[in-house]
Design a protein with these regions (language model features):
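Residue-level detector of buried hydrophobic side-chain packing
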Residues: 70-72, 123, 144, 189, ...
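Catalytic cores of nucleophile-dependent amide-cleaving enzymes
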Residues: 103-106, 110-111, 187-280
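Structured core elements
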Residues: 1, 10-12, 71, 122, ...
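Functional beta-strand-loop-alpha-helix junction segments that form "active/interaction loops"
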Residues: 133-224, 270
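An often Trp-containing, charged/polar helix-loop segment at the C-terminal end
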Residues: 67, 275-351
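A short acidic (Asp/Glu
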Residues: 78-88
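Peri-functional-center coupling elements
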Residues: 1-69, 89-171, 273-277, 282
């Protein structure tokens, strides 16, 4: 544990071997994402065991120093750990701290810029020739961006989306992505689509655009940093998953290419759950002090059942969004299970 102005604190956990810890992380990951246990708390035992192993040894120090944000630098085999879902027996870790994963301490951009003045480039696809459709994507993008808004987020327009540009399906091309990034300044880049990561095969790992696949080894060719993007949101499956050669996957490579922070996923995410999380995330981003606090408040809202579906509508902090028939459900459902909210993690700068 390294805290401001203090010497590093090292705790050796002799009772826990590396292989055992990695094994528990895998079991925990599998339990949260198991569709057969989605409406149970079967994950809770492992969530508490991992909390005791990873957080408990430092708990007194965290409280004594009044720490409010924890940055995790995770080793091989631990990077798929949904840290937000660790549990102390009473509450989840994210209910106590803002959280982020960092690739290395010397790679953090410590400059703080208020995100409330951001312009958003939102692009995505809902229709595919060889993959399942994502009917929630058009609603996700239109909820995030208000193309008629020409001014920064403020008290008078806080009930609207963000200023920026929106491109869907046929307009979500590699050429257009590059053109938009080179011709205008966007603080936030949001991509909503399918993605696939295959360990050891960068040429077969991709983010699906309308006209092509943006492969893992092509990520660094995009000019994300001219001017630098403060946040890249990868609203797609397994975009934070990597291997020994490519730590933190697509998000990790985007950080190397100049993006300050990335919000990415650890597993195959649910279309409606992603719509709910992203809608709330951008709403919280309007008033939160940091990006890490934004995702924290978003996840807390989901844990508490304040973000939910009721037949024809999605309800969240801004109000409600009508859903097309293809997304409507019978009855009511919330997103309090960690499958829906703990899979998205902030990587690199928490600010």
């Amino acid at each position: 544990m390294i805290s401001p102005g203090k010497k590093p604190l090292v705790q050796d956990i002799d009772s826990l071997k590396r292989e055992s810890l990695i094994g528990k992380v895998k079991l925990f990951h599998n339990e949260i994402t198991n569709p057969q246990t989605l409406f149970t708390n079967s994950y809770l035992s492992l969530a508490q065991q991992l909390y005791q192993s990873i957080i408990k040894p430092f708990e007194a120090n965290l409280q004594e120093e009044r720490i409010d944000t924890i940055l995790f630098c995770l080793g091989t085999g631990l990077r798929t750990l949904p840290i937000a879902a660790l549990h102390d027996g009473k509450q989840f870790l994210v209910e106590k701290y803002s959280l982020a994963i960092i690739p290395a301490f010397n790679l953090i951009d410590s400059n703080y810029t208020p995100i409330q003045k951001a312009r958003v480039l939102a692009m995505g696809a809902s229709e595919f020739t060889t993959q399942n459709p994502l009917p929630a994507v058009p609603i996700e993008l239109s909820t995030i961006v208000d193309r008629n808004l020409r001014e920064n987020i403020s008290a008078k327009n806080i009930s609207r989306g963000w200023p920026g540009k929106l491109f869907l399906n046929q307009d979500f091309t590699l050429k257009n992505l590059k053109n938009q990034l080179s011709s205008q300044s966007f603080n936030i880049i949001h991509l909503a689509t399918h993605a696939e990561f295959k360990p050891g095969k960068p040429e077969q790992s991709y983010i699906q655009l309308w006209d092509t696949q943006l492969h893992l080894d092509e990520i660094k060719e995009i000019r994300w940093n001219d001017p630098p993007a403060e946040l890249l949101v990868l609203s797609a499956c397994k975009t934070a998953v990597g291997d020994r050669d490519v730590e933190l996957g697509f998000a990790g490579l985007a950080l190397q290419a100049g993006v300050q922070s990335a919000l990415a996923s650890l597993w195959y995410v649910n279309d409606l759950g992603t719509l709910a999380l992203m809608s709330e995330f951008y709403e919280q981003l309007k008033t939160a002090t940091t990006k890490a606090e934004t995702i924290r408040q978003t996840q807390i809202k989901m844990i508490q059942g304040d973000v939910y579906l009721t037949r024809e509508k999605l309800k969240f902090s801004r109000g409600e969004i009508p859903l097309p028939k293809s997304l409507q459900i019978l009855g009511e459902t919330d997103f309090s299970h960690p499958f829906y909210w703990s899979g998205f993690t902030l990587i690199s700068s928490p600010w």
